[in-house]
């Protein structure tokens, strides 16, 4: 066994242990210093630092055992007094602790290691006990005065100030240590950590780059750089950095590979994400998270059957507390693409929204699914919920809502709602004809039936301003807009006829007949104008001779979503 520890210790040094302590990797520190003490049972410093690591981890009994071993290693050395002080500290005997440390300082007044170990006694404390930075600083400064070129003392001073926290003094000590060992990546990396705590992003990244420049395989710096870009949402840079980490790092974990896969997905390099995820799953199939990412990626590449299979497998294995809203979102999309299962897809979209209200934009997809099934009422409801949360609605989305409202047969107010919605389009894009046209179509549904109720003729005309706006816009390209222009001009010709406006009737009938010479409404009303027999229907008049039948309510064109 001693041979095994000796071989392990040969690969470990006090410098490795110092790095583990600086980085607060207590388990690694314990492993290193345990090996060092096994290889050299007389190494009091290793035992003392081993005890400090156990204390930092909250293992008071193990710390006591390490201190006892340190004393037994050399009972007559100055460090033995340090050991005694630490043991009395564990007993909260402040007076005796002070006595022992004074003896240690006197015996080792020119020994920077002894003085540093006294200082560290106040720095690494049991769980729940705050470090005494004043006493730690006192003895660490004494250690520095004993040997201003001692790298370990400078690093410990830097760590003490970092924890205090005093970023300026911490940086100063780490810079001095860096000057002593310019090829050592640790001081540079610790400086990066100081600048990160100070929220000096540029200096943080600069020192990470300096660390990597002298130690290209230094995993902690490679990982920190990738994470900095990732959490700053600079995903392209994060992807490059994660690639460097996975390719060059000396302690790469599966979590690092997973983060690279995630970054590849975010940057839309789906094939690369798929390749990496499948590689990781082959090594470790327990990472169910990766099945999610794989399913997402297959959807994005258009391989819907594979994506559906992966997500089915994922949901069979995942526990409910691990499911994300995006899981339901992608499952819904895959259900539509691979199976055409609209109803189940809608259920999953709703689960996603219920789980995460920030995914409210999915109501738009729900609305489109309902509309594709001609379920106009549910489509209208879903589009409305989507638009209620949109700060600045798009005209195309309002158009879809308006159509769904227009064709929702179960809503007695469908035409009023549709008219209001289409008018919002005219406010957004007043020079586009579509909003005016559909506002008019909705309004015509709300016009009085003057054939059945001639006394209501004066109330006819709700759609007039909308149709007039539409004609003004659409007449620029009469051939393209011919069908809807005919509908608009039929209405306007009839409106002016009802009002007894000869010139208005003539003008619109002329335009109508130019487009459609055989148009019955245009022919009849133009004849009435020419014959001088045009008599408007007025309230109280049961009818008027020669009054033509009003134009049929316009049938919406197929391009306008004519489903109902």
Regions found by a protein language model. Give the residues of each.
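Alpha-solenoid helical repeat scaffolds
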Residues: 4-500, 504, 508, 514-517, ...
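Flexible, disordered linker segments and immediate boundary regions flanking tandem C2H2 zinc-finger modules
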Residues: 536-541
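Long, low-complexity, intrinsically disordered segments
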Residues: 546-564
């Amino acid at each position: 066994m001693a041979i095994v520890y000796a071989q392990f210790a040969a690969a470990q040094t006090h410098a490795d242990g110092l790095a583990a302590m600086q980085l607060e990797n207590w388990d690694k520190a314990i492993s290193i210093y345990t090996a060092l003490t096994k290889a050299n049972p007389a190494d009091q410093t290793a035992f003392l630092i081993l005890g400090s690591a156990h204390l930092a981890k909250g293992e008071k009994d193990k710390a006591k055992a390490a201190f006892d071993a340190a004393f037994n290693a050399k009972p007559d050395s100055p460090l033995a007094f340090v050991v005694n002080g630490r043991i009395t500290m564990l007993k909260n005997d402040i007076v005796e602790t002070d006595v022992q440390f004074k003896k240690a300082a006197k015996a080792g007044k020119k020994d920077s290691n002894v003085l540093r170990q006294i200082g560290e006694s106040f720095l690494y404390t049991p769980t729940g006990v705050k470090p005494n930075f004043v006493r730690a600083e006192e003895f660490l400064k004494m250690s520095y005065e004993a040997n201003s070129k001692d790298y370990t003392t400078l690093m410990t001073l830097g760590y003490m100030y970092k924890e205090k926290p005093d970023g300026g003094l911490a940086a100063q000590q780490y810079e001095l240590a860096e000057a002593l060992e310019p090829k050592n990546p640790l001081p540079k990396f610790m400086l990066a950590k100081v600048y990160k705590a100070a929220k000096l992003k540029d200096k943080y990244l600069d020192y990470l780059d300096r660390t990597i420049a002298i130690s290209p395989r230094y995993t902690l710096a490679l990982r920190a750089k990738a994470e900095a870009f990732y959490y700053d949402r600079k995903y392209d840079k994060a992807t490059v950095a994660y690639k460097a980490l996975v390719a060059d790092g000396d302690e790469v974990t599966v979590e690092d590979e997973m983060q690279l896969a995630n970054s590849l997905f975010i940057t839309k390099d789906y094939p690369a994400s798929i390749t990496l995820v499948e590689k990781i799953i082959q090594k470790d199939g327990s990472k169910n998270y990766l099945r999610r990412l794989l399913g997402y990626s297959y959807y994005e590449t258009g391989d819907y059957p594979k994506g559906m299979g992966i997500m089915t497998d994922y949901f069979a294995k995942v526990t409910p507390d691990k499911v994300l809203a995006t899981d339901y979102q992608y499952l819904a999309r895959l259900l539509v693409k691979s199976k055409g299962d609209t109803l189940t897809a809608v259920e999953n979209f709703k689960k996603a929204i219920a789980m995460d209200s920030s995914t409210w934009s999915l109501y738009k997809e729900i609305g489109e699914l309902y509309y594709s099934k001609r379920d106009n009422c549910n489509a209208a409801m879903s589009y409305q919920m989507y638009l209620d949360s949109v700060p600045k609605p798009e005209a195309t989305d309002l158009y879809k809502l308006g159509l769904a409202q227009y064709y929702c047969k179960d809503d007695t107010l469908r035409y009023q709602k549709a008219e209001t919605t289409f008018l919002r389009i005219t406010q957004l894009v007043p020079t586009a004809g579509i909003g005016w046209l559909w506002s008019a179509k909705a309004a015509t549904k709300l016009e009085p039936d003057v054939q059945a109720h001639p006394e209501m003729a004066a109330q006819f005309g709700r759609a007039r301003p909308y149709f007039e706006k539409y004609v003004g816009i659409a007449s620029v390209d009469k051939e393209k807009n011919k069908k809807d222009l005919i509908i608009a001009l039929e209405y306007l010709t009839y409106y002016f006829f009802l009002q007894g406006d000869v010139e208005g009737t003539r003008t619109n009938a002329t335009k109508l007949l130019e487009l459609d010479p055989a148009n019955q409404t245009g022919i009849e009303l133009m004849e009435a104008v020419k014959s001088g027999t045009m008599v408007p229907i007025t309230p109280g008049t049961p009818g008027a001779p020669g009054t033509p039948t009003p134009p049929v309510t316009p049938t919406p064109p197929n391009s306008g979503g004519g489903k109902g």
